[in-house]
Swiss-Prot record:
It is found in: Golgi apparatus. GO terms for cellular component: Golgi apparatus. It comes from Neurospora crassa (strain ATCC 24698 / 74-OR23-1A / CBS 708.71 / DSM 1257 / FGSC 987). This is 2',3'-cyclic-nucleotide 3'-phosphodiesterase. GO terms for molecular function: 2',3'-cyclic-nucleotide 3'-phosphodiesterase activity.
Amino acid sequence: MPGSSLWLIPPPSHPLYPILSFLISQHLPSDFPSEAGAADARLIPEFFAPHMTLSSGISPDLYGDDPQRWLDSIPWPSADEVQVRFEGISSQDTYYRRCYARVKLDEGIKKIAGLARARGVNGEDDAKGAKTQEWLEWWRKEFGPHVSLMYGDVPISDDRLKEVAKVVEEAGVKLAEPEGNVEGNGWNGGVVWLVPTDRDIRDWKPIAKRVL
């Protein structure tokens, strides 16, 4: 994945943090070894932290040798403004979106993702910029906010997706019902990570962090 990325991580003290971490690193690869790409040499246990990607494709030239200063210069919204709420489980025919939990796209999510894109890629001040507004619409249509659960090259059938959803819910992640009568759980706020995602997956570690 070219460049660096901005991720939103659940607060480390939140109950969902260890649940999602265990699902991603052990439970799902064990139950769905083919779909999780566990045989892929690029992947090892605990291969990525639970996160919602805010933006990718960020040039290292932007933050230079002081990534923390750059990250702190961005006027991030408060924790109360950012509410991550899970919807259902989906899959796309893309390695990094092989299986993921969709996140409800509300104004708070638009604001933080748009800000990340504006400052990290588009050279704009905030999500109101023309290029960022265009990107937000494209992002919404293509895949939107989500938390990846499995990377891999193997297509996942609808029946297997239902099995994944069952495992995820049994682990303690509440998903929204399709009719919209029940809202999924999630977290408020979190920690923004700046991660050089042009490295191997095993080396995806933050070089700067910012608590909302």
